[in-house]
Amino acid sequence: MKALILSDLHLDHWSKTQNSTLFNDISNAQVDCVLCAGDACQVNNSQNWELFLSSLRVPCFYVMGNHDAYGTSMLQAREFLHDKAQQCKYFNFLDNNHTIFNGYVIVGSPLYTNFNLFGNGVVESTHPRYKMINDFGYIHNDQESGCITPHDYISLHNQAREYLTKTITEHKDGKVILLTH
């Protein structure tokens, strides 16, 4: 199987000409599918989303990135992407779920950080340096009462990890493609 692998396109930061060139390249790619590991553009930029989705000529399997949710909440961003998957025949949003395509099990999850890179415990959300990370000022929490915190990311990470471990174990004898942000 031939796949076009995309990640962190950040279409919000490109000119119309640059985006047009990219969308043309995606449309003309001689591949069986597109695997996109998130951050195409912010979900509140409907024009870029429509252009991205209209460029698809083969199935696209997509997991959400953190920047997709900038200006909204993780929940609202997921709902937006689920809606787009219903509207666009080539767009498949993988949100801790999987699908089978051409004999491959494509398993998708955002798998955000758990802040435990060195295995020395959980980072406190009150630590000043984490407030400097843009996510914690631009992504609302799901209750819309403030911004997402490191603890929210840790919870999302744990949910994703549990799903991924279970699903990969269930399909260990098959061809598995793991798609995460």
Predicted regions and their residues:
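Beta-strand-turn-beta hairpins that frame and shape the catalytic cleft
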Residues: 1-4, 98-108, 127
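N-terminal active-site segment of His-dependent metallophosphoesterases
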Residues: 1-62, 68-76
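Short, Asp-centered acidic motifs that coordinate Mg2+ and/or phosphate
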Residues: 3, 32-33, 91, 175-177
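Short amphipathic alpha-helices and their capping/turn segments at secondary-structure boundaries
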Residues: 23-26, 51, 93-102, 124-125, ...
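Proline-centered loop/turn at the N-terminus of a beta-strand
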Residues: 59-61, 92, 105, 175-177
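Generic beta-sheet signal
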Residues: 63-65, 96, 109, 179
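Glycine/small-residue-rich loop that forms an oxyanion/phosphate-binding "nest" at active or ligand-binding sites
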Residues: 74-95
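Active-site-proximal loop/helix segment associated with metal-binding centers of metalloenzymes
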Residues: 107-174
